Amino acid sequence: MASLKDMRVRIASTKATQKITKAMQMVAASKLRRAQNAAEAARPYAEKMDTVISNIASAAAGSPNASPLLAGTGKDQVHLLLVCTGERGLSGAFNSAIVRLARDRAFALMNQGKEVKFFCVGRKGYEQLRRIFEKQIVETVELRTVRQLGFVNAEDIARKVLARFDAGEFDVCTLFYSRFQSVIAQVPTAQQVIPLAVEDAARSDGPAPSYEYEPEEDEILNGLLPRNLAVQIFRALLENNASFYGAQMTAMDNATRNAGEMIRKQTLIYNRTRQAMITKELIEIISGAEAV
């Protein structure tokens, strides 16, 4: 049985840990609002970009000059999984949920006889994926030195992906990230970005509007598609950022509560043990006095 001194040390250590988790919870809460606003502000632009490209792509359907970013390479043998995770841990299942989704997709593709490659954005995802797919990771990007995410970070990643696509290193690219829904809900998401999965432009009940494009549709798409890749990556980074702080805030709140419960139980055991020792000493003193 532990001594009273050991119990006091353990209680003090738990209280110190509780202070740290509480401080981390407050920091995450303060950063969450700004990250959430940035993620929600980026969604309409990214979604509208998809809609515009879908409309133009529908008009250019069947064109022999269609960009490979839209039409593809004509095959889907080699898949590049662009996995975006965080740079830090202590955020519950945030990182592992994204990695699990990418890992399951990789195994499914390999079972179909496809070749899989990984492009890791974020240290935590790389550390988990290299345990299984070390030889299949072709590139990593770490953003831990970036104090505030900007579009330039997404453009840099997009350029590297496009360079590999132009070199014929893969046929299909899928982006993995965590979509922010709320503080307690972050949804691991997979989005095909190369070739672009064109949505049905005619969703309304009425006839689809007719547009005339100047310059030609193919020329417009050649300029829009590379930028759209950067836009979708930037959106994923912002969604990840908000999801990370939401997950960290929840994880640290749970850790603080658990620490409080541990302190309560440890204090109760300490008091009972101390009371038992005092009672034992009193009994010994009384017994000794009676013997005299």
UniProtKB/Swiss-Prot annotation:
It is a peripheral membrane protein. Its main location: membrane. It comes from the Bacteria. Pfam families: ATP-synt. The keyword Transport applies. GO terms for biological process: proton motive force-driven plasma membrane ATP synthesis. Keywords: ATP synthesis, Cell inner membrane, Cell membrane, CF(1), Hydrogen ion transport, Ion transport, Membrane, Transport. The keyword Transport applies. GO terms for molecular function: ATP binding; proton-transporting ATP synthase activity, rotational mechanism. It is found in: Cell inner membrane. F-type ATPases have 2 components, CF(1) - the catalytic core - and CF(0) - the membrane proton channel. CF(1) has five subunits: alpha(3), beta(3), gamma(1), delta(1), epsilon(1). CF(0) has three main subunits: a, b and c. PANTHER family: ATP SYNTHASE GAMMA CHAIN, ATP SYNTHASE SUBUNIT GAMMA, MITOCHONDRIAL. Belongs to the ATPase gamma chain family. Produces ATP from ADP in the presence of a proton gradient across the membrane. The gamma chain is believed to be important in regulating ATPase activity and the flow of protons through the CF(0) complex. This is ATP synthase gamma chain. The gene is atpG.
